[in-house]
Structure formats: C-alpha cells, structure tokens
C-alpha cells in the first residue's frame, strides 16, 4: 500500500526485537566533551587538561557549578532555619553548653570516677560517633520510647543537611554520614560497644544530625567541681552550626515527627498532619515547610480577596461565600451570561452608581448561610427604570432556583429611579434586543415582564461548551 494512510515500514531490523537492558551511564568529563575528548570523570578532575580553559562552553559549565553550589547552600540554610523555628524563643537566650568533644569526655568520665579525681584528670579524647551512637542505642533498648527509631530512620536527608553544616570540611561530613549509616545497618557495632550500662545515670547520646548531646542526670552532686557541669537539669543542650541552643526533653529530636508537628501546629487536625507527613516521606523538615508555605499562600489568598472585593456595611454575610471567589480572576470572563464581569465590584457607596453598578444593600441577613456565591445576572428588562428586578437576583444553589421564592423579598433594587442609562453604553450588552421565549414567573407586586438575552441564537452556533473559552461575538 502506497497511499498516505498506510503505515510506515522500517526495514532496518527485525520487528520483534527483544528489548535490551539499559546500561548504566558512566559519568564523563564535561570540559573534555566540549573539546571532543572522551574522559571518565572518576579521578580525572585534578588531571583534566582543560580545567583552566576559558572558552564559552567551559565558562557556562563554571556558571552551572556556581548555581548548583548556591542551591545547596540555600537548602542547608533553609534546613537550619526550620530547625531553629522548632525551638521556642524563651530557650534561645539561655547560656550555651561546652563544646561537644569536652562534653563527651566529661560525661564519659563522670560515671566512673569521683569528683575529686575528675578535677585532677586531663580531659579524655572525644569518642567516635559510632561509639556514641551505640551508647544511645543501648539506652533506647533499656528505655523503649514509642516511635523513636522510626523517627530517626525516616529523616536521612535532614541528617545529611545537619551533618554537612556542622562539620568544618566536606571530608568530616562524609565521615560522619558514613559512620552513622554503618551504625544503622550493622547491629554488630551496637553489640560490640558495651562499655556503657543501661543503668548509668549520665550518658552521652548522639542526636540525629550528629550533634554531641549531654543529658544532665538527676543527681546534682555528680560532678559539682567540674567546669563542664551545667545547672540546667531539664534541658537538652545542642551545639549547632548557627549557635548554641537549649531544648527541653519534650522537644528533643527522638520524639516522633507527628508529635513535633502537633506541638508546632496545634490548630491543624492530627489527620491532616499525618497525611502531610506521609506525603513528605516522613521528613519532618519538608512537612514543616509544606505547612508554612500553605499557611503563607492562604494568607496571600485572603489578602488578594480583600483587595479585590470591597464588601458592603453588612460584610459578615458575604465573607464566608465570596471570600474564596475573587472576582478579579481571569475565569470571570465576559463571555458567560451567568458571571459577573471584571468591571463590576461590590461597593459600600450606593450613591456612586455608574462606576460601581452592583451596590446591593440588604434589608436583613439570610435565613441560612448559602453554600455558593451570589451571582447577579446582567440582563435588561423592558422596564428601563430599574434594570435589576428582584427576580433577576437569584441564589444559585445545588438545585437551580431552589431558594428563589424565599429569598426574593430580601433584595431591593440596587439603583435609584433616575439611573436609566447604567448599561446602555456598556460594552458587555448588545444594542440589538430580541425577545427571549422564556417567560418570567409572576410574583406578588412585580409586573409580568419578558427578559432580553445578551446573545442571539446565531451567536451560540459553533461555540465551545467550556465556560472559560466562550468569547463574546461582537459582530452583531
């Protein structure tokens, strides 16, 4: 078949070719690739012959590296700020603890020596991170707490961020994270490090981020002569990259992240917090960022809604219905006959009719709060003295015109009797008036009128069903 509708035939290979397994991509040197040389990237950076090249492509690579470094630094800073936001302001002014190494040495020697011998002993070298973590694990086995280990394992990204910030060089950061992961993966390390007993009143544990943490025991006379002794008995002392902070035991990082979220956001429902935490993969920092960003976006939406709507004097009636529907949005198109155009705003000034034509004073509030916003139909009646009749102002509820009769008596005409030319020069309304076959429902005290439609029947031909894509045909 040579017709245009026939499928193409590719004769290069067999039709039923088995799929090959994708090979793992080996990273190459981008600078060498710019100059037509293929070089493996591992161990090549120091010996690259194009490392000092200043051509346009290599300069572009340098700029990309700067952007990536800036992004990493920004993420670390945001992680630090979110961690600091978990700490109450009343605890930030407390005096700081000693350095982590000295604290580790003090706590290690406190349970084995007397205060007199402790004052004469030189400080022991700080214990490695794996040993401290093993001690913390022994403590956890002796006193199990609900959700402590899942909270620790669920936040590896946070651990890497804290470790990367607290370490002086990248090498120490890698050593911290490697030792931490080795301690988590292999239980032999925990079994071999049995130098601490679970009954020890003072123990040095390692926080999730690799900070050395000193827990002061319940015995105040354990080391009174030591300069490293701290008076705070009920606080967790943390040495961080941005300064020294002191946390109560109720807010330490061993708690489940859901409990921390409940303490930070008491107004949120626990089910909502649990769903957000699951969506973030158990990462506490990501969940806090999501909740803070949602709160800021909600505040911004309320601010824009207040700017776009000038509510009347009885604005409490409209706040729960119109606050979430900003009229200035692009979806309030002129092409829909059942929507308010962008030029129409609510105003508390009923005398200034022409620039703000929809000033609707209310006689008394609604009998029940409606669930949908108030839609005002901009149709013209035969009686030009009052363009908006009471039966034109309807509340569109779940069933159309359900509450029309019980709400009709609550509206009055928004225009005085002398406002005959409000919509005559409006670009929304067509100058051609055709009779609408629909007949209005008679009402007590209201004349029987026939409504005029904005569009003719020809305007509805070849038109999309989507209300957002309707365009007013001004050819008529």
UniProtKB/Swiss-Prot annotation:
A matching Pfam family: DM
UniProt xrefs under SMART domains: DM (SM00301)
Major localization listed first in the record, in broad terms: nucleus
Keyword S-adenosyl-L-methionine belongs to the record: no
Subcellular location: Nucleus
Regions crossing the membrane: none
GO molecular function: metal ion binding; sequence-specific DNA binding; sequence-specific double-stranded DNA binding
Region (Disordered): 89-130, 147-195, 418-476
DNA-binding region(s), chain positions: 29-76
Keywords: Developmental protein, Differentiation, DNA-binding, Metal-binding, Nucleus, Sexual differentiation, Transcription, Transcription regulation, Zinc
GO-annotated biological processes: adult walking behavior; male sex differentiation; regulation of DNA-templated transcription; regulation of odontogenesis of dentin-containing tooth; transmission of nerve impulse; ventral spinal cord interneuron specification
Tissue: Expressed in the ventral spinal cord, in a restrical population of neurons migrating ventrically in the developing spinal cord at 11.5 dpc.
Disruption phenotype: Significantly increase of stride length and extension movements in all limbs. Mice have major difficulties running at higher velocities. In water, mice spend less time swimming and showed frequent twitching limb movements.
InterPro entries hit by this protein: DM_DNA-bd, DM_DNA-bd_sf, DMA, DMRT, UBA-like_sf
Domain DMA per the UniProt entry, residue ranges: 255-290
PANTHER family xrefs: DOUBLESEX AND MAB-3 RELATED TRANSCRIPTION FACTOR DMRT, DOUBLESEX- AND MAB-3-RELATED TRANSCRIPTION FACTOR 3
Family indicated by similarity: Belongs to the DMRT family.
UniProt remark on domains: DMA domain interacts with ubiquitin.
Functional summary from the UniProt entry: Probable transcription factor that plays a role in configuring the spinal circuits controlling stride in vertebrates. Involved in neuronal specification within specific subdivision of spinal cord neurons and in the development of a coordinated locomotor network controlling limb movements. May regulate transcription during sexual development.
Note: DMRT3 is a marker for a subset of spinal cord neurons (dI6).
Name of the protein described by the UniProt record: Doublesex- and mab-3-related transcription factor 3
Taxonomic source organism: Mus musculus (Mouse)
